[in-house]
Regions:
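Terminal alpha-helical anchor/extension segments at protein ends
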Residues: 1-271
């Protein structure tokens, strides 16, 4: 059996913080796997990049009968099992180096349950769907095209779940707030668990050059009396603040209009 080869990422997927104009996007991984070949793609909803491939020498079936065929077939199954296990181990190693949020499997559906059996628990928890695709011949554009419906379905579900929590949370004594002023205030208090944003939402605001407090009104910071500085888009600064506090940021695309009714920005609170 050949030693699998792994390509390294050729584009800039690094750990640097996003520029203020960039909005966070969930990281996706697509694993294509056949009985003898595997390919790994990583990226986001807009673009995937092939980052690894694995090829193992798995013998093909033959038509001879008797004990010889049985032994040969058992050998093939063992080689396939080793290939799947090796692929899952390498995928998990990559995940540890460059984590992603969701995983999609692609290839023959009959291998899916075998792959799931060998996936690390952390990867199983991120598995959201399967696509039928030619593992060895598919272009990166086709992989993205097949994966996109799964990605969009996952986004719709997460947005629906967040909206349900928001609706429940904005009741009296609930754990959610809506509107830019309220959200910025709760960000300053570090009480936000999830920041919800309508795609494309921008708004002007103010920031404190000393403590970083964000607001939409005032001339001086209520915390340290520093003169507030105007910001063309305070929403980007809110996103940066959220990421610095390890807050989940969810961009609404499919249900954007529903969040726009709440001022295009909301927050689910820790307490």
């Amino acid at each position: 059996m050949n030693v699998p080869s792994m390509m390294h990422l050729a584009t800039a997927m690094n750990d640097s913080e996003p520029a203020p104009s960039e909005r966070p996007s969930e990281r996706w991984c697509v694993l294509l796997l056949s009985s003898r070949a595997s390919r790994i793609f990583c990226g986001d909803r807009e673009r995937l990049v092939e980052v690894g491939d694995i090829h193992d020498d798995v013998h093909r079936r033959h038509s001879q009968g008797g004990w010889s065929q049985a032994r040969f077939q058992r050998g093939i199954e063992k080689e396939i099992e080793d290939h799947i296990k090796r692929t899952c181990e390498l995928l998990f190693a990559r995940f540890q180096d460059e984590p992603f949020d969701h995983l999609i499997l692609g290839g023959p559906s009959e291998l899916s349950h075998r792959v799931e059996h060998d996936l690390h628990t952390d990867l199983c928890q991120r598995l959201v769907g399967h696509v039928d695709i030619d593992v060895e011949r598919a272009s990166v554009e086709e992989v993205h095209r097949r994966a996109l419906p799964v990605i969009e379905a996952q986004e719709r579900q997460r947005e629906q779940d967040a909206l349900a929590r928001l609706t429940e949370g904005i009741a009296p004594d609930g754990h959610a707030v809506t509107g830019l002023d309220e959200v910025l205030e709760l960000l300053s208090e570090q009480r936000v668990e999830t920041l919800l944003l309508a795609q494309g939402f921008v708004a002007p605001g103010l920031s404190c050059p000393r403590c970083g407090r964000l607001s939409t009104t005032g001339t001086s910071c209520p915390m340290d009396a520093a003169e507030l500085q105007p910001q063309e888009n305070i929403v980007d600064h809110a996103v940066e603040r959220a990421l610095s506090q390890s807050i989940e940021v969810l961009i609404f695309r499919e249900h954007r209009s529903e969040l726009e009714r709440h001022g295009s920005i909301a927050a689910l609170l820790r307490y």
